[in-house]
Amino acid sequence: MTTPASRAAQSTADAAPSDNPLLDGPGRLPRFTAVKPEHVGPALDVLLADAEKALAKATAADTPTTWKDFVLPLQHATERLGHAWGIVQHLNSVMDTPELRETFNQNLPRVVEFWTRMGQDQALFEKYRAFRASPAHEALDAARKTAIEHELRDFRLSGAELVSPARERFAAIQEELAALQQKFSENVLDATNAFELLVPDTEEGKARLAGLPDDAIASARADAERQGKTGWRFTLQFPSYFPVIQYAHDRSLREALYRAYATRAAECSPQDNTALIQKILALREEKAQLLGLASYAELSLVPKMADSPAQVEQFLRDLARRARPFAERDLAELRAFAAEKLGLPELQAWDIAYASEALKQARYSFSDNEVKQYFALPRVLDGLFGLVERLFGVSITEDHAEGWHPDVRFYRISAGDRLVGQFYLDLYAREAKQPGAWMNDCRGRQHEEGGVVQTPVAYLVCNFQAPVNGQPALLTHDDVTTLFHEFGHGLHHMLTQVDTLAVSGISGVEWDAVELPSQFMENWAWEWDIVESMTHHVKTGEPMPRALFDRMLAARNFQAGLQTLRQIEFALFDMTLHQQAARALAAGETDPVQRILDAVRAEVAVLLPPAFNRFQNSFSHIFAGGYAAGYYSYKWAEVLSADCYAAFEEEGLFEPAVGRRFLAEILSVGGSRPAIDSFRAFRGRAPELDALLRHNGMVEEA
C-alpha cells in the first residue's frame, strides 16, 4: 500500500493536457490561482487511470520484485495522484467555496475507493510479502526496510487479510467514514460562520465594548464595514470571539458569544453534528471488529508508541493525579478573587477567561493586550527564523511562489548554497478557512533517479487576527507559541535527510511522537534572548522591557493545573469514547457520547461547563482530523519534548553540539526508525516525566 494521499512524489511521464494545473506533478510548485473546481474531475480521470496501470504492472508476474522495478514505479504514480489530491484538500481547507466544496465531495469517494482497493489488493500484498522475504530486501538500507514494514502493516490495517464479504464491507466503511468526517468539518465551519453579533453604533453600544482592547474594537468595526453594516461585528472566529470572552466587562456580551461558541454544530443548529458523531463511532468500531480488534482504540494504537488503551489511560490518570492539587488551588484562588474583586460570587463559564485575565493582571501587573503590543508579526518571524538558523545551521529567506490568497508568503530554507526545503505561510483568519492551526506537507523529500533530491515543501497555517488600520498584525504570546509550535512541525518535515519518501519528514512517524518537535519549539518562546530579539513596541519601537518579560515568566504556569486537567479531560474522553460509545449505541442508549463526557469530567475535572455545552460537536481533532483515540498524543509527546528541551537547559541553550545532535537524531531521521530509538539516541536514556512537571510548575516547593 501507499502512504497517505497528502504526500508528494516524483512525477511520471505526463500523458495529460498541459493546461490542467493539477497534472503538473510534484516536480514544480503548485499553480494555486490556476486551479479551478472544473480541473479536479478531469485530473483525477488521468491520475487514477495512470495509478491503475502502475498497479497492474506492479502485480504482473514478469515484474521483478525489486525496489527499482516493483516499489518505485507504483510509488511514482500513486504519489502523483496523492500530490494533486493534496492540493485540492488544502484549497478546500483554506479557500472554501460552494463550487470547490461540491467538486471535492463528488470526487472524494473516487480517491478513497482507489486507496482502499489498493490497500486490499491481494496480489500486491503477496508481492510485498515475497519482497520482504527476498535477498533483494536484505540489500536495502534501513530506511527502505522500515518503509516495507510500514507497508505490510498498513495492508493488514486496510483489511488485506479479510475475505469476502468482510473485505467489501471494510471498503464501504472507509468510503463512508471519509464522507462523514468531511461533513463534520464542513458543519463546524458553517456553524462558526453562521453566527454574528452586531453591536450598534450608539452610546449604549459603545458602553458594551468597555474593557475590549483597541485592536479588537477596530477589527470588529472593520468587519462590520466589510459586510456593509454599521457598528461592531463579532463572530465565532477565534480572533473575534476570544477578546470578548477575555476582556469585555459586559457580562451579557460574554454570555451571548460563549453560548453560541459552546453550541456550534449542536442540536440547536442546522449543522447539527450529533448524528454524525454517533455514525462515525459506530463505523470505526465495526472497522476494528472486522480486523479482529476489541475496539477502535486498539486499532488506533497499532502504529503508535503506546502499547494499549490501558497504558494510555494509566498515563493520563497518573498525570491527572499529579495535576489535581494544583488545579484545585488554581480554582479556589480564581473564585475568591472573582467574588472579592469582580463582584462575581458565582462564576459562570463565560466568566472564567475574564476573571482569569483580571486575576493575572492583578497578580503579575501585566495584561495579554499589553504584551501583544510588542509582538508585531514581521519582527516575530525574524526572531523565529534567527533562532532556527542559530540552532540548526540553516538560513531562511523569503522566496517567490504563487499563493492561494494575497496574504500568503513563501520562504526557502538553505544550508549554504544547498536548498533544504520551502514553506508557505498563511497566518490570518478568514471565513472561508478552517479554524485552528496546522502544518501539512505539500511534497516530501526523496532521492530521485539520476541523483536529484526532491526537496520538501510545507504548508503552515494559523488563524491570527489580521492587520488593522495600517499596522502590522500583532500577536498575543499564545499566538507566538502557536507559531513556534507549527514551525516545529514544519522543521520536522523540512529538515529531514531521509531519502525514502514513505519515511522522510513526518511520514511514518508514530502519531504520539509527531508532536515532539512542535512542542519542543514552544519552549523557545519563553527564553529572554529570543523574546528580546523579536519584540519592539508597535508605536514606540522600544524592545520589551526585561521587567515585563520577568512578569510574563512568573505567570508562565498561571493556572497550569487547570489547563493540564482540561487537556487530560479531552484525551481521556477520546480514549474512553472509542472503547465504549459504539457498544452503548448498539445496546440502544440514546446519547452515550454526552454520558461518557460527563463521566470523564466527574472523574478528572474540577471546573464543569454548563449542561448546554456541546464541546464534542466541534471536536474536529477526533471526528475530522487524525487524532481519533489519539488525542493523548499531545501530553505523551510533551513528556518527550520537555525531556529533550531539558538537554539544552543542562548543556547550554545555544551550545552548537546539542542543536546538531537534536537535528541529527530527531529532526533528520523522520520516520525511518522508531521514535523511542530516536529519543534514546538524543538523550542517552528512556524518557522521564520530571521535566514536564517542572516546566508546568507542578512540583511542590520544598
What are these regions (language model features)?
Residues 24-39, 88-107, 130-172, 235-275, ...:
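Short His/Asp/Glu-rich catalytic/ion-coordination signatures at enzyme active sites or charged loops
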Residues 143, 147, 176-179, 186, ...:
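Active-site-proximal, well-structured secondary-structure segments within enzyme catalytic domains
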Residues 239-242, 287, 416-418, 427-431, ...:
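Short, glycine-/Ser/Thr-/acidic-enriched flexible segments
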Residues 79-90, 149, 153, 259, ...:
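Short, hydrophobic/amphipathic alpha-helical patches that form generic packing surfaces
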Residues 2-39, 46, 219, 231-233, ...:
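C-terminal, non-catalytic "cap/extension" segments appended to globular domains
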Residues 465-484:
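Short pre-active-site segment immediately N-terminal to the catalytic Zn-binding motif
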Residues 49, 53, 57-64, 80-97, ...:
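Intrinsically disordered or highly flexible coil/loop and linker segments, enriched in small
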